[in-house]
């Protein structure tokens, strides 16, 4: 056990689907996994282990922002032996061609956070998804005939900001989605010798002020969840 995870040793599978919202983790466990058991609930950050297509698989919440996500990722890797972390989350869009509920697979993550510079002794760390997980997500999307956009996302430390210059910059660099964790997750995985990937569903369009409800973000992102589950199976082979 750790200060933040009260699961016993061996409770987690080698692959964990990692959700910002612990209720999304609970939804995945209850609706997609067989024989799912709750294994951790400290601070209401729920985690479950069950089976998907006869493979042991875990799903857990990681909270909002790089600091929270990084704590759980580090502990899962170093204390529980987790090898693969797949963030299954939501994001906002700025590009005109992207719509609500579009699926995005992150190849890399830019950020306004300083955490990777601190980790990498003030040099610029290239925060990229692990190729095995990235390619498994791409293959799973193709297998399921689900269209997924692929490219760079932006991990921000500031959820509430109205920086129009930043939005223009993100559009110019063709940033597919704005979220709060991927860059930090990729950095933690690299530092501790694990693999990480990230798949997102567009829950908001920042410039068009379009949004989904909290309930929709918990329960209606089936395409993303299916891709992540099928990718986990590919990693097990």
UniProtKB/Swiss-Prot annotation:
Keywords in alphabetical order, please.
Answer: Glycosyltransferase, Transferase
Q: Which domain of life is it from?
A: Bacteria
Single GO biological process annotation from the record: purine nucleoside catabolic process
InterPro entries documented for this protein:
DeoD-type (IPR004402), Nucleoside_phosphorylase_CS (IPR018016), Nucleoside_phosphorylase_d (IPR000845), Nucleoside_phosphorylase_sf (IPR035994)
Per UniProt, where does phosphate bind?
20, 24, 43, 87-90
Q: Is Membrane among this UniProt entry's keywords?
A: no
Q: Which reaction does it catalyse?
A: a purine D-ribonucleoside + phosphate = a purine nucleobase + alpha-D-ribose 1-phosphate; a purine 2'-deoxy-D-ribonucleoside + phosphate = a purine nucleobase + 2-deoxy-alpha-D-ribose 1-phosphate
Q: Where are the transmembrane segments?
A: none
Look up the EC number in the record and give it.
Answer: 2.4.2.1
Annotated catalytic residues = 204
Q: What class of enzyme is it?
A: transferase
GO cellular component entries? cytosol
Residues at site: Important for catalytic activity?
217
Report the record's disulfide bonds: none
Which residues are involved in binding a purine D-ribonucleoside? Answer: 4, 179-181, 203-204
Q: Which Gene3D superfamilies match?
A: Nucleoside phosphorylase domain (3.40.50.1580)
Recorded GO MF terms: purine-nucleoside phosphorylase activity
What does the annotation say about its assembly with partners?
Homohexamer; trimer of homodimers.
What NCBIfam families does the record point to? Answer: deoD (TIGR00107), PRK05819.1 (NF004489), PRK13374.1 (NF009914)
Cited function: Catalyzes the reversible phosphorolytic breakdown of the N-glycosidic bond in the beta-(deoxy)ribonucleoside molecules, with the formation of the corresponding free purine bases and pentose-1-phosphate.
Q: Family per UniProt? A: Belongs to the PNP/UDP phosphorylase family.
Name of the protein in question: Purine nucleoside phosphorylase DeoD-type
């Amino acid at each position: 056990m750790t200060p933040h995870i009260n699961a016993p040793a061996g409770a987690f599978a080698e692959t964990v689907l990692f959700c910002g919202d612990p209720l999304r983790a609970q939804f995945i466990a209850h609706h997609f996994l067989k024989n799912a058991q709750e294994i951790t609930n400290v601070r209401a950050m729920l985690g479950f282990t069950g089976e998907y297509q006869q493979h042991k698989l875990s799903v857990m919440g990681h909270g909002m922002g790089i600091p929270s996500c990084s704590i759980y990722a580090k502990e899962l890797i170093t204390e529980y032996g987790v090898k693969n972390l797949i963030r299954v989350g939501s994001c906002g869009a700025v590009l005109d061609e992207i719509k609500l509920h579009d699926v995005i697979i992150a190849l890399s993550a830019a950020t306004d956070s300083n955490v990777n510079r601190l980790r990498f002794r003030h040099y610029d760390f290239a925060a990229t998804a692990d190729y095995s997980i990235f390619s498994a997500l791409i293959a799973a999307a193709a297998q399921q005939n689900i269209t997924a956009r692929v490219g760079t996302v932006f991990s921000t430390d500031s959820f509430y900001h109205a920086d129009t210059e930043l939005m223009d910059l993100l559009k110019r660099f063709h940033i597919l989605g704005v979220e709060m964790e991927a860059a930090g997750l990729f950095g933690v995985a690299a530092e501790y010798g694990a693999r990480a990937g990230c798949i997102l569903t567009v829950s908001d369009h920042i410039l068009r002020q379009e949004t989904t409800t909290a309930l929709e973000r918990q329960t209606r992102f089936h395409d993303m969840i299916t891709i992540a589950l099928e990718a986990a199976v590919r990693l097990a082979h």
